[in-house]
């Protein structure tokens, strides 16, 4: 049984949950989840957790994402995308220069209102379910960040561009906000998620077309996941103690990367097996001082233990 992360490709049409169901069916395991919903009309990278890989998905939701989007100026729909009912169509008299200026004005932080039709929850219910029942919930704006925008192409009313954005950013809302800035509104008509963190569409796998063996072979093992987090190595004899839930004291550590108090740290044994994720109780720079004074204090607090054998 493999545990880890799969970089999946979601085609247009299926929901993110459909991708999860396909992996469950082909790998014959119920422990499958995804790390960030991708709209049915969109395609691209969807991070899938398999078995104990589901327990680290929260860290993938916090990664930057890159999207390619095509929007249609002057078209306004209920859902802010091409699948929604048309609310209004307007003329767009903006010049190409004005369109580009409006797009680039959103680079940086701004307060974005999530669309009424989205997978976001309100009092335990998905917004899109409430909206279909006629219950439109107006959520407060959320501060998001557009790190950069490039490859802007203007062809009449259809405008495409790429954007690198913070987690939780709705590209549909960004398109509508650009449209409103131009005085005509806009709707996303095509959307591709090209990357999540360092994971790109080129390395993604369409699980609907892949055989079970290929899916299993493409699972990234836990030991190679979350490589942006600091790493510590404990003495081999501490393995069982940690897997049984014991907190990590200084004498257990053999070596460590630099880390700050409050950071999440990956805990490995000397064989290279990922044992746990833990929260640092101190800055790593202070550990040598503790060791010099022979103070065997707790330095890491367990958050998740991975007993995969």
From Swiss-Prot:
One of the GO BP terms on file: tRNA pseudouridine synthesis
InterPro entries hit by this protein: PsdUridine_synth_cat_dom_sf (IPR020103), PsdUridine_synth_N (IPR002501), PUA (IPR002478), PUA-like_sf (IPR015947), PUA_sf (IPR036974), tRNA_psdUridine_synth_TruB (IPR014780), TruB_C (IPR032819)
PROSITE patterns with a match to the protein in the record: PUA
Reaction equations catalysed: uridine(55) in tRNA = pseudouridine(55) in tRNA
Taxonomic superkingdom: Bacteria
Alphabetical list of Pfam families matching this protein: PUA, TruB_C_2, TruB_N
Keywords: Isomerase, tRNA processing
Enzyme class at the top of the EC tree: isomerase
Active site: 39 (nucleophile)
EC number of the protein: 5.4.99.25
GO terms of molecular function: RNA binding; tRNA pseudouridine(55) synthase activity
Residue span(s) of domain PUA: 229-306
Keyword NAD in annotation: no
UniProt family annotation: Belongs to the pseudouridine synthase TruB family. Type 1 subfamily.
Function text: Responsible for synthesis of pseudouridine from uracil-55 in the psi GC loop of transfer RNAs.
HAMAP family attached to this UniProt entry: TruB_bact (MF_01080)
Protein name in the entry: tRNA pseudouridine synthase B
